[in-house]
């Protein structure tokens, strides 16, 4: 890929790239919609991601091109014009990173050229947007010798998502893209940003990613609505509990104080956030003791909660996960990511991968009308520079 990208870079910009980098996508093993509720998450970086090449310019022009959106062509704007622009589509993610780096005091004193190409399926809920954000920060760090640390880039990436794009997401995606490590997941406390690397050793079992192939736009989904519902539920619980987030409430305490939330929808939203947080801790413990059956059971319970209490699945994700759960050799399956479309994951015996794909494809096509896609990817490193 890099060879063809270098040739394309020369064609587009009539110069050679000075720096190259790769930022991964991610899966979240368990812990969905807990990151903006101050809870735990359990993500891992994957070896699908976004590649980028960059060079400085002698003017103030920023020129961005994506091989994934060739029909859009080169998107150009000035270093002094960093406003959100709907016509700039994907380029708003890197534009936001430039804006917030500059506002943080980092010197980006000229324009630049950037070419990117990703192999994360677009709209698959495998975190392509965070991959682009962190990739952009990493390229600019080298290009302009910025003394910016990984954690600050992660925080700025979230700021891009929240304040520039308009999605009130948590920090999980940017964190795992920036901090991932090969063959390890991260148990992250999103309230404190304390984290632990955990080996992703599943014995004879592997994680299979199943894509609904249904597109969704996160900013236009009910993501922000769920955040508001959780905030409303938290405010009711705070009448008697001294807590800052739903993630700070254990299941027993919640059950004792659930009467404070009279509206059923708000009760269910809070119940998911709190029980899912407990499931993350239980899943971490199960993986440590190599209890893959219990880990799979927790995946199933997570999906049921996301379907019934949080209502972020939909017929496509439900068909994938619930069909996979019935396949022999599958210990558990659930949606991963924000929901509404995107992907599900299954913990499947390595000898049953073909059975999983065949059985899920048949039922999914019969019910939905088109086929899902399957990926088997290794757990990889976070953002890194690569040799040109």
Swiss-Prot record:
GO molecular function: ATP binding; galactokinase activity; magnesium ion binding
UniProt-annotated location(s): Cytoplasm
Enzyme kind, highest EC tier: transferase
Active site: 173
UniProt-annotated binding residues for Mg(2+): 129, 161
Chain residues that bind substrate: 32-35, 223
UniProt pathway annotation: Carbohydrate metabolism; galactose metabolism
BP term (GO), one: galactose metabolic process
Catalytic reaction equation(s): alpha-D-galactose + ATP = alpha-D-galactose 1-phosphate + ADP + H(+)
Positions annotated to bind ATP: 66, 123-129
Entry-linked InterPro entries: Galactokinase (IPR000705), Galactokinase_bac (IPR022963), Galactokinase_CS (IPR019741), GalKase_N (IPR019539), GHMP_kinase_C_dom (IPR013750), GHMP_kinase_C_sf (IPR036554), GHMP_kinase_N_dom (IPR006204), Mevalonate/galactokinase (IPR006206)
EC number(s) on file: 2.7.1.6
HAMAP family, per database record: Galactokinase (MF_00246)
Protein name listed in UniProt: Galactokinase
Lineage start: Bacteria, Bacillati, Bacillota, Bacilli, Bacillales
